[in-house]
Amino acid sequence: MPDVFSAESRLIHAGTERVPGQPATPPLTPASIYVSQGTPHPGRGYGRDGNPGWEALEQALGGLEDAEAVAFASGQAASMALMLALAPGRERIVLPEDGYYGGRVLADRLRPNGTRPVPVDLRDLAAVERELTAAPSLLWAETPTNPLLRVADLTGLAGIAAAAGAPMVVDNTVATGLLQRPLDAGATASLYSLTKSVSGHSDVILGAVVSRDAGLLADVRAWRSSGGGIPGPFEAWLALRGLKTLPLRIARQSASALAIAGHLAGHPRVTAVHYPGIDRPGIDKTTSALARRQMPDGFGPLLSFEVTPDSADAADKVVARSQLILPATSFGGVESTWERRARWPGETAPVGLIRMSVGVEPVADLLTDIDQALEVP
């Protein structure tokens, strides 16, 4: 589709061929082998090397950042391929101290290969520069972070990484390519768990790497094929279907999340609210200004908050009392969910922090449920 049309229109029509007699929706292709005439189709010979469903999904995802995408069986599989492609020869993986714990687990597994994870507050550009220049490094960024929703300066990080000769990966799962484009800021690659907002219906586990670096794309494709981290055709079909409604969903979820964050900030039982774009007591207002500049169209569906008394028991009671919001993990689905995040092994979130994924229910209903859940003494 011509670039004259918006990203939203291109997503809706992704995977559809304007050919008379052909389906108006992308087909599901559950094939493990492909017909050849002596020479296999480029990229398709055996099912581990390609599938029309992946290719349609990858084209749509890449289009959001004017780049190319490689789909994987999960976000962790995508992360592993990136680390295996970029970490060799580097002593450090500099990553956020409050980022997704799965990334820390993967980075830690590279220690036997001579690479170690170095956690740092990515908002502190001077600290990031010190770590990147101390030894050959890979910068593994995440903004907003999960679950504290901290916002780091992508352009500033990219400049420091480039000066240090360090590739920069940005986990863009929370924002998606609609709300934030890391490659435009100078990132080497964007990383996604498509399980979350992109698929949007809590029925798919997939991941993706998006980049404009042809060499890196070839490397991660090779790791996908040789390592077997391929997406299933049905999962790719579901994710592409979800991607078509992402603009509508993310806009509503972002607006509702902002309203809920503001409501929670004034609640007597809430001691802290973590959400980009809102000014909070004790937080430098430049943080919200950066968020608004970096994510001008919204801040995504994820927020977190802390309650009094500050304990696991108090937070668990709030979560258990909900009548509409589901007590469940993950985020980005059409249904609202929440959980006490520190219940997961290895999670470094405050013990009483509740992470909430805002769905597409009417925000008035969500506020009603939140208020009655917070009535627990």
What kind of feature is each model-predicted range?
Residues 27-28, 33-81, 85, 102-110:
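Conserved N-terminal alpha-helix of the aminotransferase class I/II PLP-enzyme fold
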Residues 16, 32-36, 174, 196, ...:
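Glycine-rich beta-alpha junction loops
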Residues 220, 315-323, 369-374:
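Short amphipathic alpha-helices in soluble, non-transmembrane regions
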Residues 35-39, 216-217, 310-314, 345, ...:
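Short, acidic Gly/Pro/Ser/Thr-rich loop/turn segments
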